[in-house]
Amino acid sequence: MFDIKRQEIDWGGKKLTLETGQVARQADGAVIATLGETVVLCAVTAAKTVKEGQDFFPLTVHYQEKYSAAGRIPGGFFKRERGATERETLISRLIDRPIRPLFPEGFYNETLVIAQVMSYDGENEPDILAMIAASAALALSGVPFLGPIGAARVGYQDGEFILNPTLEQLEKSDLDLVVGATRDAVMMVESEANELPEEVMLNAVSFAHESLQPVIKAIINLAEQAAKEPWELVSYDDSALAAKVEELCYDNFDKAYRLTRKAERVDALSKAKAVLDEAFPEADPTEKLRIQKLAKKLEAKIVRTAILKEGRRIDGRDLKTVRPIRSQVGFLPRTHGSALFTRGETQALVSTTLGTADAEQMIDGLTGLHYERFMLHYNFPPYSVGEVGRFGAPGRREIGHGKLAWRALHPVLPSKADFPYTIRVLSDITESNGSSSMATVCGGCLALMDAGVPLTRPVSGIAMGLILEKDGFAILSDIMGDEDHLGDMDFKVAGTEKGITSLQMDIKVAGITEEIMQKALEQAKGGRAHILGEMSKALGEVRSEISNLAPRIETMSVPKDKIRDVIGTGGKVIREIVATTGAKVDIEDDGTVRLSSSDPANIEAAREWINGIVEEPEVGKIYNGKVVNIVDFGAFVNFMGGRDGLVHVSEIKNERVNKVSDVLSEGQEVKVKVLEIDNRGKVRLSMRVVDQETGAELDDNRPPRENAERRGGERPRRDRGPRRESGDRPARRDMEPEFAPAFLRKDS
């Protein structure tokens, strides 16, 4: 019934298994990949025909984590997997980016890749396994695919690289780097690093590429056993048509790409392309698409030739020059921190908001619930490129760009112990002509500094490009949108003066050598240093204090055995503290208490209240208190947060008090001295030895009572004679009839 094919390899000391032929047999290609006890199923399907008028490759990748994979049931009202989470979206992009360039030009069949995590052991991360499974499924499907690719994650600790580190190892690692690559070329890099030098980053990429070679070999072996017949790809001889397009458009395209302003250049290109419609009025839809593709190739040829032969870029810059930069902080008056960062025709308006611990992002996933205190959200409205388009919930691109900027800034943030705030950075791209994610990094850094967040060091980011031909290559600093589209590499680097914090690379062609990558990193280092210098003109260092509009957060510690006293039964005490003082109070299991309010006086009031609860009263010390209950023999006074003591009627005044309520009332503020604390913790207080106006201690001039140890004096014990033993007592039924109860009498 099943024709199962399997490949097993030892990969970094663990067994990696690729299997096909048992599950999802109706898909064009399906593979179950297993590493440890983590299992990912990936299935590939593709449409057999192309939709009419389609001129692009519609590849869709979906990655999904099943809660059942980790033995969990989804939280909340809906008990099933719902829309893609941010993590699932990011991993979908991680799978998409290295495989998309490997589909041949002209293949426009709709293709769907679905990767699902079916089992998760908490040790082997499923994202790398999903990339491998997707590559293997494509290799088996027969769909035109110039792969396969392999994937690997690299950590770095104590000067050593770690292949596919566990979650525990990643927490201690200075690097989290993911590489997707073919046998001969690196296609994709995604990383976060703790300010590592360029040499370490380059060696990490090389280590990953070498380490994933056994995976590629296993996929090839599996494909030799189980791959379907390859699809035929329709090709056209467009040499004559290409010559005609070049004849009609070359001069106008060349003039357009000498215009340095984007809007003028776009208008000129539109007019130049209008000539093609007039020249080919009888062209059918398919032929029109081919003409448009040839025109795009001609544009690329003009731009690439100018860069390689003349060293001239679209906007007139040389290869290393960064566009003019203008930075401004405090741009928005009511935010906690803000910055407007403009680089050429790319602009980001970024704000920072500080909040308390209850504003942390709750994330529910395979590893359970956890909370994130740093959030970065990136928005790309259509007006930023002068277009009409969808505006609303963030798309995959916005989520991906936001995460890239998050990785760049995250390593330089202070620890929660040093800066106990929840931090949200919001970046709105108001203009875009390339490298908007790196503008978010620069603007986000300035907004954080403006908000008073004590960063380790400022961070800047730059996008690099590459033009690669057989006779040479050129590396471009701070690429524009057109250079991104017409070039061969998008290489984003962010970091401090000390080292790299984030690196993302997407390569569209094979042949990127280690020499090219090394030169790109060195050129990016110079660009980042220049940008840091320009940023420092707006704000050279972190503000010494946070904004007056931001909440103040202070911490204190209480003994663990006192936590329940601070919280109170059903949270009664802590709710009273919050309601009375106006400060938020958060208590952790280790006894750490965080007090927050926009008014420092509220924080101080809450601190004093909590200190009053956890501190032990001291005999002989004077405290401020409040009468909470009046009884016949005195009054109960709350004098230390939740601590009450008794002021006996004799300790209210030196003179006799006949009725306590004549002197005191509930809610009255009084000053008391602690006289005694018994072995049960009950406290005896006195008001009469304290000046109720000043709080000063008074001399106790009242003479002590005689025989004070026994109120009312010693009374003689009445002698009732020897006590009878119980056996001497007459039984109830032996009582005299006249004294016995009626129901015991014999005559009753």
Swiss-Prot record:
One of its GO terms (cellular component) is cytosol. Keywords: Cytoplasm, Magnesium, Metal-binding, Nucleotidyltransferase, RNA-binding, Transferase. It is an enzyme of class 2 (transferase). Its main location: cytoplasm. Residues 693-748 are annotated as: Disordered. The keyword Transferase applies. Its EC number is 2.7.7.8. The keyword Plastid does not apply. Residues 699-736 have a biased composition (Basic and acidic residues). Residues 551-610 form the KH domain. Mg(2+) binds at D484, D490. It catalyses: RNA(n+1) + phosphate = RNA(n) + a ribonucleoside 5'-diphosphate. Residues 620-688 form the S1 motif domain. GO terms for biological process: mRNA catabolic process; RNA processing. It holds the Pfam family RNase_PH. It comes from the Bacteria. It is found in: Cytoplasm. One of its GO terms (molecular function) is RNA binding. Involved in mRNA degradation. Catalyzes the phosphorolysis of single-stranded polyribonucleotides processively in the 3'- to 5'-direction. Belongs to the polyribonucleotide nucleotidyltransferase family. This is Polyribonucleotide nucleotidyltransferase. The gene is pnp.
